[in-house]
């Protein structure tokens, strides 16, 4: 199986007060090693990367790279809405031992497709690591269109895309119009089956923070020829709960209920509201992830 296919977890960043909680981060890494997560994605949206300082980001990369010690691949989110800054941080991640980079489309400033093409080509030219494109227009305000992805797929070190547009027709077109080695990952937990069925290669998952083994086995079984759509659908209520408020608010609360002291999100995000927390607990109990006490 190629690197960066299967089940990748969009890992949270645990906090204790104003600091990153490295003992808990180590526990989370062990949890994923033990439960067959195929690769890690750190410093992405779920990791609250916009609220981490530059020095904190470097510390997280160094800690994860050193602790994992090549046991599973590590992808680092290095994207921003400034090409120069993206290049600089991508070089830092490369120097610190990242195996690949996840680079989101520039957000807020809404570049044209030509701007997106130039941005990614400039970054790819500046580093030697594999790059995974990341399309999430609901957050960035810009869609990475099929023709742009097709053109970028011809760049040697652009290896694939995390596709979170929610548009399965777009996903299908990307798969159909790019070469066979181009990796297409679902960026939405509730669309993993659909993306795999279209010829995709896995997921970068939020829900895998709490059910890593189930997420991994679903994809392993599908790739082994077991086409069981109902097995995927079974987890939809859990996926829905992970987005009842802005990610990663619910998943961090879920991890707290599972015994991982990941702490509250950093402002401007806040802890999960009381009503939603009651709903979350019920769903976690329904899935037998926490006790019924």
Swiss-Prot record:
- What would be one Pfam family of this protein? DHDPS
Record CDD domains: DHDPS
Active-site residues per Swiss-Prot or TrEMBL entry: 134 (proton donor/acceptor), 162 (schiff-base intermediate with substrate)
UniProt GO cellular component terms:
cytosol
Indicate where this protein is primarily found: cytoplasm
Choose any GO biological process term that the UniProt entry carries and state it.
diaminopimelate biosynthetic process
Protein EC: 4.3.3.7
Q: What does this protein do?
A: Catalyzes the condensation of (S)-aspartate-beta-semialdehyde [(S)-ASA] and pyruvate to 4-hydroxy-tetrahydrodipicolinate (HTPA).
Query: Which PANTHER family is this protein grouped with?
Result: 4-HYDROXY-2-OXOGLUTARATE ALDOLASE, MITOCHONDRIAL, DIHYDRODIPICOLINATE SYNTHASE
NCBIfam families, alphabetized: dapA
> Per its record, how is this protein called by name?
4-hydroxy-tetrahydrodipicolinate synthase
């Amino acid at each position: 199986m190629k690197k960066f296919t299967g089940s990748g977890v969009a890992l949270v960043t645990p906090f204790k007060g104003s600091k990153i909680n490295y003992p808990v981060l180590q526990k989370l890494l062990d949890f994923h090693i033990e439960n067959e997560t195929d690769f890690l994605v750190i410093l992405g949206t779920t990791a609250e990367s916009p609220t981490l300082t530059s020095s904190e980001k470097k510390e997280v990369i160094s800690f994860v790279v050193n602790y994992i010690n090549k046991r599973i691949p590590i992808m680092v989110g290095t994207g921003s809405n400034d090409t120069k800054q993206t290049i600089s941080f991508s070089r830092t991640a490369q120097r610190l031992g990242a195996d690949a980079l996840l680079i989101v489309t520039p957000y807020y400033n809404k570049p044209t497709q030509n701007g997106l093409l130039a941005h990614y080509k400039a970054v790819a030219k500046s580093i030697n690591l594999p790059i995974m494109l990341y399309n999430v227009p609901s957050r960035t305000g810009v869609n990475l269109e099929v023709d742009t992805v097709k053109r970028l797929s011809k760049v040697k070190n652009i290896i694939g895309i995390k596709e979170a547009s929610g548009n399965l027709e777009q996903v299908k077109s990307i798969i159909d119009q790019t070469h066979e080695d181009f990796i297409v990952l679902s960026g939405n937990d509730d669309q993993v089956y659909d993306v795999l069925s279209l010829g995709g290669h896995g997921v970068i998952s939020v829900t895998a923070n709490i059910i890593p083994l189930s997420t991994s086995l679903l994809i392993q079984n599908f790739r082994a020829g077991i086409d069981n759509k109902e097995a995927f659908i079974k987890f939809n209520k859990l996926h829905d709960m992970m987005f009842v408020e802005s990610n990663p608010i619910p998943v961090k609360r879920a991890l707290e209920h599972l015994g991982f002291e990941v702490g509250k999100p950093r402002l401007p995000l806040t802890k999960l509201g009381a009503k939603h927390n009651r709903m979350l607990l019920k769903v976690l109990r329904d899935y037998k992830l926490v006790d019924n006490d």
